[in-house]
Amino acid sequence: MTGARCAFPVILTLWSAMAGASEFRHEILDFSDLRGWAEDDHAKALKVFTETCADMKDPDWQSLCALAQTGPEARTFFELFFRPVVISDGNPALFTGYYEPELRGALQPGGRYRYPVYRIPPEAREASPWLSRREILTGDVMSGRGLEIAWVDDPVELFFLQIQGSGRIRLPDGGVIRVGYGGANGHPYRSIGTELVRLGIYEAHQVSAEVIKNWVRRNPEAGEALLFHNPSYVFFRRVDQVSPERGPLGAMNRSVTAGRTIAVDPAHVPLGAPVWIEKEGHGPIRRLMVAQDTGSAIKGPQRADIFFGTGADAGRAAGRLRDPGRMVVLMPIQRAYAMLTDADQ
């Protein structure tokens, strides 16, 4: 099909002072500049966009959300009412992946199910930082308080559940409960992959989630010490309002969608905005996704985490991803060109 085109092709470049003294470059493109744009399934992207756009409070976005809800032809909708904008701070783009882990667990301890998934205690909310990971797991501060949501069978998978921030627990009877981020102990996150490189155990290009898990399991004592290297500890809450068939809740409190949701830095990319992804490296991706999530490691205008789905296969795919490319935010037309006025003020 032939989509609508910009009435006058234009590339407008401007520099504006944002986020302190840093310089951010905004480049307005035409849709013909987006590699692979014509080949994408725009209807899938529009469906994901409509799932969260009603929560965007800005009038420019609200008016476009109302139009999107009427069921327009998807590619035409995006090309008529948006302009592609590259926002850059001079750092190269970086794409990584995330997923929703699924662990084996039970609602009562016993047998293999010995590792508790905790709710946050009240005093941890009031202190920053609170106790470290080592202090929480080797002391008795959590004992006898009824803070356990469930017990799982693998402390390594529990550690990675805390990195992801949400996940599912499959019970012995086949049922599933979902847990979401419920707070943290206030300590900074330290990468155990980086520590393995520092110790000379692996080269940086060799490190992935699967490599780390396997090493910890092969070296139980040193593996436990490695996990304690990260003092950050994440607590959870039970999430019952989302059916197991849907994705986990993202930062907009709506389910995220595999292959169409990204986590972004909301200081630069509006939550709910469509974002064109051009991921290079192994298995290039050219796809319109939607910014529906955030992450503590996602900083900068050219940084995104792609959601791969639930379970082990999704985890392996997400763990392999660390590639360059380009992010292009689709902004309402008036908002895109208002950048010129803002830069002149």
Regions flagged by a language model, labelled:
Residues S16-G20:
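N-terminal signal peptide c-region/cleavage motif recognized by signal peptidases
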Residues M1-F8:
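Bacterial N-terminal signal peptides that target proteins for export
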Residues S22-Q345:
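Solvent-exposed, well-ordered loop and adjacent helix/strand elements within mature globular domains
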Residues F8-L14:
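Hydrophobic helical h-region of N-terminal Sec-dependent signal peptides
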